[in-house]
Curated annotation (Swiss-Prot):
It catalyses: 5,6-dimethylbenzimidazole + nicotinate beta-D-ribonucleotide = alpha-ribazole 5'-phosphate + nicotinate + H(+). Belongs to the CobT family. This is Nicotinate-nucleotide--dimethylbenzimidazole phosphoribosyltransferase. The lineage of its organism: Bacteria, Pseudomonadati, Pseudomonadota, Alphaproteobacteria, Rhodobacterales. Pathway: Nucleoside biosynthesis; alpha-ribazole biosynthesis; alpha-ribazole from 5,6-dimethylbenzimidazole: step 1/2. The active site is at residue 305. GO terms for molecular function: nicotinate-nucleotide-dimethylbenzimidazole phosphoribosyltransferase activity. GO terms for biological process: cobalamin biosynthetic process. It comes from Jannaschia sp. (strain CCS1). The keyword RNA-binding does not apply. Catalyzes the synthesis of alpha-ribazole-5'-phosphate from nicotinate mononucleotide (NAMN) and 5,6-dimethylbenzimidazole (DMB). Keywords: Cobalamin biosynthesis, Glycosyltransferase, Transferase.
Length: 337
């Protein structure tokens, strides 16, 4: 389908997305019950395989074309000193991605995934959201389109990640708008700020919510008013994957904030997504609880870039390898239990 050009079109397209293939899911469940193992012996791997099979429309699927997308954006609010690093680090890290020197490059290679980085108007940061909306509707839709169009329609698994100095503050503001509570509930150390830095981030989140009241009543306005271009691009990619029935592994706090916008806008929008890991950012667990998702890994990561999601590709690969590659009792000539 064509790329949406307005927030209304975007929400309408997401709401019209179809669910998983019930026949494939049922076939996968039936096959799982016939494999040479005691019932439930592979634990969560069995659930993952059945979930994946339903979304791919194949009771005996394979993972052959995983894709990792990293989006980069700069934030006007970074000028307020919310990060331990200056904004120019975003540009420098994009160059590092391009030369294969970042963690996500290594983890994507290890997982057998294609990986690409997409910088979005780095020379023009979003507006400081304590002074008004971070983006116009045209601006947020342009960023959503970057993510939407970056998805390879032949991919069979998607991980999205980000780079953007100041984006934990933006993600905290979005999460606070979506789920309420105090700003302190949603702010954390990000790139490593101290207690004074966390307090500053909380104050800035509060200011942003006060200046942009529409963010508290409309999830897509929360993305526009408080988010960044890389958050919008991740939302666009995850939404397009939903329409294409490409399963998604979510990364950490910032990725999950972008994804949560979709679920709050359209219930069920994240049924095709699982949580790859639980971030060391203290608010990530709270957001996953709201989304009803349990992370596959708990490794204390807080890097971003899609790193935890890329690591989790191997877990899902293992689930699918067992499901599709194991023999049934009949095939193996083994007596069933």
């Amino acid at each position: 389908m064509t790329t949406p050009t307005t927030l209304v079109e975007f929400q309408t397209a997401l709401a019209a997305a179809t669910g998983p293939d019930d026949a494939a899911r049922a076939g996968a469940a039936e096959r799982n019950g016939q494999l040479t193992k005691p019932p439930g012996a592979l634990g969560l791997l069995e659930d993952l395989a059945i979930w994946y099979a339903g979304w791919r429309g194949d009771a005996r699927p394979r993972i052959t074309a995983p894709q990792v997308l990293v989006f980069a954006g700069n934030h006007g609010v970074a000028a307020r000193g919310v990060s331990a690093f200056p904004p120019e680090v975003t540009v420098q890290m994009v160059a590092n991605f391009a030369h294969g020197g970042a963690a996500i490059n290594q983890l994507s290679d290890l997982a057998g995934a294609t990986m690409s980085v997409h910088p979005i108007d780095l020379e023009t940061p979003t507006a400081d959201f304590t002074q008004g909306p971070a983006m116009s509707e045209a601006g947020v839709m342009a960023a959503i389109a970057v993510g939407w169009e970056a998805v390879d329609t032949d991919a069979d698994l998607l991980v999205v990640g980000e780079m953007g100095i100041g984006n934990t503050t933006s993600a905290a503001a979005v999460a606070n708008a979506l789920y309420g509570g105090a700003p302190e509930d949603w702010t954390g150390r990000g790139t490593g700020v101290d207690e004074a830095g966390i307090a500053l981030k909380s104050r800035i989140v509060a200011e942003g919510l006060a200046v942009n009241p529409e963010a508290a009543t409309d999830p897509l306005q929360a993305l526009r008013c408080l988010g960044g271009r890389e958050l919008a691009a991740m939302a666009g990619a995850i939404a397009h994957a939903r329409i294409l029935h490409i399963p998604v592994i979510l990364d950490g706090f910032i990725c999950t904030a972008a994804a949560a916008v979709l679920e709050c806008a359209v219930s069920g929008a994240l049924d095709h997504a699982i949580a790859g890991h639980g971030s060391a950012e203290q608010a990530h667990a709270r957001m996953l609880h709201h989304l009803g998702k349990t992370p596959l890994l708990q490794l204390g990561l807080r890097l971003g870039e899609g790193s935890g999601g890329a690591l989790a590709i191997q877990i899902l690969r293992g689930a699918i390898a067992c499901h599709s590659g194991m023999a049934t009792f009949a095939e193996a000539g083994v007596a069933g239990g």
